[in-house]
């Protein structure tokens, strides 16, 4: 087939929401359930050709997403409703497409992203939850959210996050730029909201694990700054559980004009 006869290739971006509790993470892997595998299967059915997706952030086992962004290329020309309603009809109930947008050739869900934003939800109550048990992390000791917020502000800006980096992290550098980190209380829920250019492996969960020690008055407010300066993972607290973590937003240059739906999860406003 000559170049003139080649069908046009369309590049499509999707916003994806998922409950990660029954998946072994985002990334497709042999013999285990992954969000990527389910999404690619549904897209391939609608496109009637094999589809491979690329995501903004590969979330770990049990981690959720309300603002994941993916892109894929296809020769299939479909209406937006096919990529949303049609794909959703082929997806399991715990994964959904939130929006669709045709993007230019230079767009890449991961490499075009300028920042990622996560929210970590702690159910801070003496008794464990039942209904939202896989969507929040239960912590029974009373937490001082204002104390946690103050302690966290030392993490702003460009820093070496070795103390909050998983041992198995494959990133070439531990340096990341944190744009904001806020800790707020909403009734029995404590929310840690953090935005950075990128994250090292388990960075949010390791930060939250140590902040909970400060919030429970087991460590002084100055402890987080001391951990950051020490550059030693063994000094920090245990990694917080996956259940409470959500990828809520990914930032891109304005020229791509991607939709920005409410981040959530649940009752949380922007």
UniProtKB/Swiss-Prot annotation:
Domain of life the protein comes from: Bacteria
Q: Where is the active site?
A: 60
Query: Which EC number(s) does UniProt give?
Result: 5.4.99.12
- Single Gene Ontology BP term? tRNA pseudouridine synthesis
Under the GO molecular function aspect, what terms does this record hold? protein homodimerization activity; pseudouridine synthase activity; tRNA binding; tRNA pseudouridine synthase activity; tRNA pseudouridine(38-40) synthase activity
> Where along the chain is substrate bound?
118
Q: Which residues cross the membrane?
A: none
What does the subunit section of this Swiss-Prot or TrEMBL entry state?
A: Homodimer.
* Record protein name field: tRNA pseudouridine synthase A
Task: State the species of origin.
Answer: Escherichia coli (strain K12)
């Amino acid at each position: 087939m000559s170049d003139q006869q080649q069908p046009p290739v369309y590049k499509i971006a999707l916003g994806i929401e998922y409950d990660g509790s029954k998946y072994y993470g985002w990334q497709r892997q042999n013999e285990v359930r992954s969000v990527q595998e389910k999404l690619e299967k549904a897209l391939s059915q609608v496109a009637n050709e094999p589809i491979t997706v690329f995501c903004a952030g590969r979330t770990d086992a049990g981690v959720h997403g309300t603002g994941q962004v993916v892109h894929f290329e296809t020769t299939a020309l479909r209406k937006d409703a096919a990529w949303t309603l049609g794909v959703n009809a082929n997806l399991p109930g715990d994964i959904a497409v939130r929006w669709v947008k045709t993007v230019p050739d230079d767009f890449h869900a991961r490499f075009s992203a300028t920042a990622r934003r996560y929210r970590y939800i702690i159910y801070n109550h003496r008794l464990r939850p039942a209904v939202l048990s896989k969507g929040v992390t239960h912590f029974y000791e009373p937490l001082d959210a204002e104390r946690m917020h103050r302690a966290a502000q030392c993490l702003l800006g460009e820093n070496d996050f070795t103390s909050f980096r998983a041992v198995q992290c494959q990133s070439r550098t531990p340096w990341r730029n944190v744009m904001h980190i806020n800790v707020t209380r909403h009734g029995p829920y404590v929310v840690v909201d953090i935005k950075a250019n990128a994250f090292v492996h388990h960075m949010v969960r390791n930060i939250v694990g140590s902040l909970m020690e400060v919030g429970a008055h087991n460590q002084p407010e100055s402890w987080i700054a001391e951990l950051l300066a020490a550059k030693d993972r063994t000094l920090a607290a245990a990694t917080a559980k996956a259940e409470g973590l959500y990828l809520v937003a990914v930032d891109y240059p304005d020229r791509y004009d991607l939709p920005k739906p409410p981040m959530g999860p649940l009752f949380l406003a922007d």
